[in-house]
Amino acid sequence: MTDDKTPTFLARDLDSLSATLRAKLDAAGFDRPKLIGLGASLTGDVATRRDTRNRVSGAASAPSSSEIADAPREGTVATKRLSELGRGAIANGELSFVVMAGGMATRMGGVVKALVEATQGKTFLELRLLENAVLSRIAGRPVPLWLMTSDATDEPIREALTRLKAPAHVKTFLQGMSLRLTPEGALFRGADGEPSSHATGHGDLVDAVRRSGLLEAFVKEGGKVVWITNLDNLGATVDPAILGAFIESPAEVMVEVCDKVAGDKGGIPVHAEGHLQVLEEFRLPKDFDASTVRVFNTNTFLVRARALLTAPIEWNWFEVEKKVDGHPVVQFERLLQELTHALEATYVRVPREGSAARFLPVKDPEELVRRAPEIEAALKARGIL
């Protein structure tokens, strides 16, 4: 490993990358000037630098209760109308569903999470395909399903899609990739002498789906809404009533939030820098009490397709410290919820319990065992199982 931290030496190290690694980085939209600039920023006191980089400026305040709408309740006249509006949009080809599938199940043996069995002998990927098949059958047309993969998951997922004979409207696109640096800003090399690559966070989705051409083609064909969620949150399925509510709203992005329970940590909606936006706790002003906000982000978003395609978005790159081969390293990541800073956002509180639950994430084997009955009940109630 080199300790030189000047941009010139990092640039020279990047020049020396193998052709194979360069090709992989290029395919994943690697931004060389950005990494060189970020490396050069690794100076001064670490805590001060991270506070300056990560925390929003100015004051923050909790949203009012009127700014968090409840999800449409089943059985009401209003919900029936919204459901009809949403179903009509799906039948007209106006919806695409995106699943973020770049993660490895590090607490489940380090395998590709999409290929982990979730319930009833079916993997997360198989359940997402089954969900899409049911939705497409009801709509009377294929509903586009796009899977954002990472360098680690792309090939296994594409092989699984081939093996499962996934329909042509199921596509994959590759999220971004970058290289880890030393704490001083030099290119980190592992015990094998090779650079250490990493995925750069789910905030990559916007640039990645633009780069893929899928979004542009979808918009040209009349697509209007992109629904985005995590692979492992099987509760986050397409709800026509929520879609209808978003269609009727003036917002460009709708965020699904749910009530906090003990132990929950995640981004929360707050007023900051002139926007009601989702911020992780490390981004909040030091004097802001996160407990004053009783809901948090489920990482499920509905976004206007044209805004997702064309809106100018200035991304923050967040400094994350990791350890590789026993050495401290720095990697830079983006967060998808920054959409709520760039686009006008609205928030909908969704249930997290019962067959209507929309927040059922799975992070480890114990949670999978605990959640399996809830997942099964939710999917059965929606006609997926």
Language model features with spans:
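N-terminal glycine-rich phosphate-binding loop and ensuing alpha1 helix
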Residues: D3-K171, L179, F188-H198, H202-V206, ...
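Solvent-exposed, flexible loop/coil residues
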Residues: V112, T119-K122, P183, G213, ...
